[in-house]
Amino acid sequence: APLLESLGGDLTIQDNTRLSSVDLSSLECVDDYTIEGNDMSESDQYDLLVQLTCASEDSLIVFRADDADDFCATGETTVENVYLNVLGTDPIDLSCIETITGYLEIENSLAPSIDLSNVGTIGDELYIHENDDLESIDLYGLAEVGGYIQLSGNSSLVNVYMDSLETADSYFYVQNNDQLEALELSSLLTIGSTFYFYENQNLGEVSAPVLQEIGGSLQFSWHTSGGAESIYMPSLESLSGDLYLYYSYYIEEVDLSSLVEVGGQVYIYQVNYLESLDLSSLEEVGSQLYVYNTSLDSLDLDSLTEVSSSMAVSNNSSLESLSAPLLESLGGDLTIQDNT
């Protein structure tokens, strides 16, 4: 389609094993594209990606390791936007970058590792997605992200180093990362919106030991064949949205021992192997409180004074004791059923 000049939607040219050439010579600046799994040479695909990628003058676009090396050779440490769609299999070293004033996006990259270890701030979003071969991302020095963080569809990703991260001003999503084993967020203090985990089947532990506030919900859902075994957030005090643990069979331990208030519901459903749930500081729940089908032998809600809607504890086959000695106000039904 050499005469095509504009495209109203996304461009996908994917998994065409005999497709060796594409002529879109009149088309420039496509907002969202996926071009992978075809029979194009690396040089032809490089030329096509350069042609189609939208970027401001102060942005860095990396398709090859040489692009990263050339940028670092300039001595620059600040850049507006960084976009990586790496064609080759060499590791990428961008440790020269200290500040990204706009966004960082990494997609469809074949590089096994990317070093951005000295980036301290990202002004907008951090979006790492659909990288089939990427195994490790070093963002060790990253302290602040001004937009959202999303890690999704990275099928080989094992390690993400974000040990210095303190704030994410919007949501933080971690979903469909099949090989991700742990997420250590040892410096994280606040998340502006929802903290969301979905289908990360090898994720053993999520640790955020100094996290104090989540501006939205905390959600773990659909970890049905493994993953999300331990949730360790002992300093979390405020959760504006829901606490939502749903069809995550293999969660065994949840430490939310400082959590005082949940603005929405506490909904724990089909978390079959859950043996330890520490909500010992929880005082108020803004909607319903529901605990269904766990392996808890006790549910101690020793600080709970108010539930704005209903409270139900049911089908917990090992439950021997339920304690809520300070509960004064319950806005709906109280159901304790089939805990046998």
PLM features per residue range, with description:
Residues 2-5, 257, 280, 298, ...:
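Thr-biased low-complexity repeat/linker tracts and other Thr-enriched repetitive architectures
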Residues 22-23, 44, 93, 114-115, ...:
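The leucine-rich repeat
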